[in-house]
Amino acid sequence: MKRIFTLIAACVAVFSCAKKNEVTLLPASDFETVVDGRNVSLYTLKAGDLAMQVTNFGGRVVTLWTPDKNGSYEDIVLGYNNIESYVNNPGERFLGAVVGPYANRIAGGTYTIGEETYNFPQNNNGQTLHGGLKGLDMIVWDVDSVTENAITLSVLCPDGHDGMPGPLRRPRR
């Protein structure tokens, strides 16, 4: 009986000291491309036990690695492993992205402010969803600054962008 207990204790000690899985970052080269004449890149940020990857295409979070209670790392963001899947996937185009310039739907792709009626491209069964065909999720954002643990992105949509009135400048940190 004493030998069985010793064997069990030894197994527990060995398995509890087993190497925890590590963060597996996506290669930046899988996100290097040009969209609408603008360079797209993948940025890796680290702070403490966290690691996050962000692309300036749509200002989207691509991965977020965090340890569980046992110290094993998991990516908790639903997304793709390469830029082509984000650019060419209209069915799931909003994964990890900033939506806008508005979220949700504009019924019939039209609304009125005062006497002015605005019409937008419809991209969701006769409605305009999350900014329309060329919402913030489909634009290459400017990278204003990047450090080891922070990134600041911004985008400027001119007056009339996809039918929207007025210019819109949107920062994201």
Over which residues does each language-model region extend?
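C-terminal motif of bacterial Sec signal peptides marking the signal peptidase cleavage site
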Residues: 14-16
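Sec-dependent signal peptide recognition
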Residues: 2-8
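Surface-exposed acidic/polar loop and edge beta-strand patches at domain peripheries
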Residues: 3, 18-173
